[in-house]
Amino acid sequence: MDSKLLLVTQSGSVDDLYSLIQAAPDILQKVDVLPIIHTPLHEASSAGKLDLAMELMILKPSFAKKLNEYGLSPLHLAVENDQVELALELVKVDPSLVRIRGRGGMTPLHLVAKKGDVDLLTDFLLACPESIKDVNVNGETILHITIMNDKYEQLKVLTGWMQKMRDSDDVFIDVLNRRDRGGNTVLHLAAYENNDKVVKQLVKCLSLDRNIQNKSGMTALDVLRARGSHMNKEIEEIIQMSGGKTGGSLSGIQEWYIFLREPVTFKEHCKTRIARYRSRISDGSRNALLVIAALIISATFQTAAQLLDKEKLDKVKKNGMRFSEFQLWGCNTVAFSIAILFSFILLPVGRAYEWWYFIITVPLVFSYFLLMYMMHGLSFFFLIIYEGGLFLVYLLVLYVKWKRCTQMKVRKPKSDLISDNFKNMV
């Protein structure tokens, strides 16, 4: 950096900066052309020259994303030198600065977690929630870094953030179960450190996988027991009570390469086709088909709810239900059942949708058959149950079997080199 520009930066004078620019209009551009350099913004951020730093963000916003010869951005330097106000102002201008990877893949958010500033950590997360996904060159997430530096309060903030945020639940689950270069999750680290407070905090997260194996095939429980006489018995009990197991007890789980080399069965073929249909259908088509299914459910239920007039009802009680009427009610029940199942298949992927759907539709189906019993008596009720209800149960059982097949017990890969599309295979 030019010596005159360095002196102006160290002084923090905005007026002196513009005087220098008037004398040499290209002075900032000469700095900007270099890919790695200690820019005036680096110097201002390190020294806490707030006014000058904000002026440089206007003149040359590209400075904020450059790394100096030590692999640090201006925001890294502001965090390292406890320039909290300046760091927050930089993030206000460009929240993505929180995700800049410096030396070792460390982001400013990682540095904040390492230093232990809870307030700044929260501010960074609020400004850029996606930054929680970032990992360093060792594959360590912010959770790994927090545990390795024994920052318990920061861990409570992070786990609380992941559990209370309403969006991107899958992202936070991946962060919680992410493995570092050695295949160790945050639970492995906590078990190795014999840190009972951290283990208790982690197992409160329902999305935490207690049985992930590292590259040595060890679960968190194995890592804990490997400490021998130094093992904390309380931690062992906590992990076991939360569902943690040893790697040996998981030996029956199928390896990925075995699963992939096996021939595709007809059931897997059908499962794949349905899964692709659910994932590829557009929102517009899904909404239109759900409306059609809802209309069919409404029409068939209304047909079942139509009361016979007194003359026909007496005739039915005297002579019984005619075969044609029985077929009408049977076909109506089948249509009702298929519409219920079809609308279930059309739901977006996610267990929350499925559970709410069951909560709503089970009383509806029950009231449908109860209505027929009240209108036509026990004998007709059992006939319809045999033709329609049994068909519905069969379809639901078939779907449950298919659903279980999609969640086959396959050992998780020993690295995180797996895309979201591949995860959807099983």
UniProtKB/Swiss-Prot annotation:
Subcellular location(s) of the protein: Cell membrane
Keywords: ANK repeat, Cell membrane, Membrane, Plant defense, Repeat, Transmembrane, Transmembrane helix
Pfam families: Ank, Ank_2
One GO BP: response to salicylic acid
Chain's gene name: BAD1
Protein's UniProt name: Ankyrin repeat-containing protein BDA1
Main location, first listed in the record: membrane
Function: Involved in plant defense. Required for basal resistance against Pseudomonas syringae pv. tomato DC3000. Required for resistance against nonpathogenic bacteria. May be involved in signaling components that function downstream of SNC2 and upstream of NPR1 and WRKY70 to regulate defense responses.
